[in-house]
Amino acid sequence: MRKTIVMMLTLVCNLTVRAQQAETIESFIANSHEPEWYAAQAEAWQKRVNENPQDQWAWRNLFRATCYHDQFTGGWGENQDESRTADIIRKMEATLPNSYVLNLSKGRFCLTTDSAARRGDNIYKAIEYLPEDACAEDINYLACRLWCIDPDNKDVGNLFSGAYKKRWFPARIMQFSRNMLLSLQSGALYFANGDAVTAPMKMIQEALKERQDVTIIPISYLHVESFMKALCKRLNIDPLSLNVQNYGDKYGEDWYKHYESDIIMYLIKESKRPTYFSTDILSLTALDKDSIYNEGLVLKYSPKPYNNFDVAMHNVKEVYSLEYLAEPDLVYDSWETSEMLDMNHVTLLANLISKFRKNGDAFQAERLYRILSKCVERCVSKNPKETEKRKAYYENLLKGQLQ
């Protein structure tokens, strides 16, 4: 009995130590957690800060943990200046004024009274103070923020190249992004929801100097005057002026979908460039669904119908590099998007199996079936609670294409 009690106490102590161990706080798109985890991490990093108030890495993680906890629990409330995140900013201002970590953090959250931070002035300061050992995620963040507020700045390319060299995005995301980029027509416009999707493509352009003819446009950036001004200049078209208030009065809560759609259509018509979208665009905007066609991993705008299946099949056969998806030793990394990326391939490409068969190309049909089957296999093994149900659904989806 005594031995059992000792063993249990040892186990409890070990678990307690692990629970209190400070861990790097990553973006939730890479690795998300429950609010309780962020609260515990905030306590752990607060201890590190107390031990060494000049430790910028500790402050960085304390801020991120606190910010995510507030974000996921409604901690900002009606007045974000009274939140715990705001308190961390104030303490950093007192302890580490004009520091890299303070300016980096203000890029993610700033007091409503801080007009300089709201303008983005802190982004330039963070870049000026950027340490050589800055983590890849933070370099990528600064690259995206600078791209948004000052897209013609030479440091945009330098930062994206630096983030690429440090390999923040997993290789499979980079390959997925490269496949999409290579399939676009010359001089194309590519719209996607936010910089988390577009950053890998921008890295490929800047670091590898590939497909720099393509103009990548995060939809959220359409609301930023400096980005729009630079974009219209690049496309050699007149700037567009829209009254946001009119959209709010007319469309209510969905005003932004119509506002963004009108900007997108203006850019398409005035630039006369081939235009593509990420596959989630239809749920994010008020674009005409009948004018958007699937070409494999991307959607294309076309005012007239055309044989988009031929283009999609060409992309699978000649453009996309998909063999890595079938490698037996390919396993999921820690990123939250791993499973989603596999399922994107299955959902978007499965119907092409039957198209290849009907065209008499049995080799490509079997090749695509083999690749997508591996995607399903990985996805199912990641979710044991739903294994049989999910496996049956996706296996039937793929097998149905062979009939």
Task: Give, region by region, the residue ranges found by the protein language model.
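Bacterial Sec-dependent N-terminal signal peptides
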Residues: 1-24
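Generic domain-boundary/flexible-linker signal
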Residues: 15, 201, 225-227
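ER/secretory pathway lumenal C-terminal domains and tails of membrane proteins involved
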Residues: 20-186, 206-403
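Short periplasmic/luminal acceptor-recognition loop of GT-C membrane glycosyltransferases, typified by
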Residues: 189-201, 278-285
